[in-house]
Amino acid sequence: MKVIVVISGFTQKNHQNTGSKQLWRELRLLDDLCDGEDAIIHLKEWDSDWKSYAEYINSLEPTEVLICCYSWGGGYGMPQLSKRLQCDVSVVACDPVYHSPTILGRWWAFFDRKIKLDKNVTVVGWLSQRGDRLDGDKLIGGKSICRERTFDYDHTSIDNSPEYHQIAVLAAKTYLQT
């Protein structure tokens, strides 16, 4: 079983036409590359119930999960999900922004923070921008982290960027064909 999860950012809802939803639509066209295995490709909001969702994914017994995440989806959703998964996780992170799990720590999103990754995480794509007041935070830990690539977008448009979509689609093709 192959599992791909696209996690949207702050203020993004699944019913809205966002860069995350556009990416999810692109990735859904790839599931026929799975060479006989089943594939599910889900779009999730950053503040989903990650404990229940991880239980569901774990019940499918995948050997690896691919997560493409943006903003708080990368700074909160992805770390919350990946630490609960019982398999390796590959990540394409687009301008991930730290989000504290506590109410008192929420203001930390406006300062440079580090996003700690669990030991089962490999970052295969990492895009950020540095021009906006709210910019991507550093990823640390995990199995391995690829080089961060910085682009000339603001935070609210980088998830629509062709660079993010190309990197995510390439990672998904590689994942589905292995």
Model features per residue range: what roles?
Residues 8-11, 18, 63, 102, ...:
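Residue-identity detector for threonine
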